[in-house]
């Protein structure tokens, strides 16, 4: 009787270990999918402008550029948009090209174009650009190289951020 019980107990422990391993693997997967900044494949990302014309992202990134992925249903994104607009209106911000990308419908994107005056482009799904969490922003130098990327809100008026931009401009 005790032999049967110990085999059953060992089997339960094995199943428990497998479940823990599965949970750990799922956690690692979720972390890397949703909490890390994906690489920006500028030549493979095709966006749509307000006229319905398709563009490769690499065609839109001239000079120093900020590429910003957002959505209208994202609270942190909506909180950040006025801060970006304020930064864009500074002398430093006027020297940077901004590209906003969303998966919102065209009518929703138009509301934000009109409200903020942003260059907003659309993707059918942000996951087509390997973006699974938003907001996510990329700062590109004049050679189209990503020099800064972050998931979440940026502090657009932070001195360190402004110094980083000034370094790129010089």
For each predicted feature, which ranges?
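Short helix-capping segments at alpha-helix termini
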Residues: 90-95, 116
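Short, polar loop motifs at secondary-structure junctions
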Residues: 103-107
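Conserved redox-active cysteine motifs that mediate thiol-disulfide chemistry
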Residues: 69-86
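N-terminal targeting signals for export/organelle localization
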Residues: 1-48, 170
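A short beta-strand-turn-helix
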Residues: 44-65
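Thiol-/selenol-based redox modules, centered on thioredoxin-like
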Residues: 142-170
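Short, internal strand/loop/helix patches
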Residues: 99, 110-143
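Short pre-active-site segment immediately N-terminal to redox-active cysteine/selenocysteine motifs
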Residues: 63-65, 69-73, 133
């Amino acid at each position: 009787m005790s032999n049967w019980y110990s085999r059953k107990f060992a089997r339960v422990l094995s199943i428990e270990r497998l479940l823990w391993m599965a949970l750990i693997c799922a956690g690692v997967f979720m972390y890397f999918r949703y909490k890390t900044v994906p690489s920006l494949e500028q030549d493979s990302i095709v966006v749509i402008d307000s006229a319905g014309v398709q563009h490769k992202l690499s065609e839109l990134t001239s000079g120093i550029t900020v590429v910003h992925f957002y959505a209208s249903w994202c609270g942190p994104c909506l909180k950040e948009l006025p801060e970006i607009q304020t930064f864009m209106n500074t002398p430093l911000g006027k020297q940077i090209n901004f590209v906003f990308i969303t998966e919102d419908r065209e009518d929703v994107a138009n509301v934000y174009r009109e409200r903020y005056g942003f260059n907003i482009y659309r993707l059918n799904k942000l996951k087509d650009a390997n973006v699974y969490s938003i907001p996510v922003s990329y700062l590109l130098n004049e050679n189209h190289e990503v020099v800064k990327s972050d998931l979440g809100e940026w502090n657009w008026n932070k001195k360190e951020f402004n110094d980083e931009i000034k370094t790129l401009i010089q």
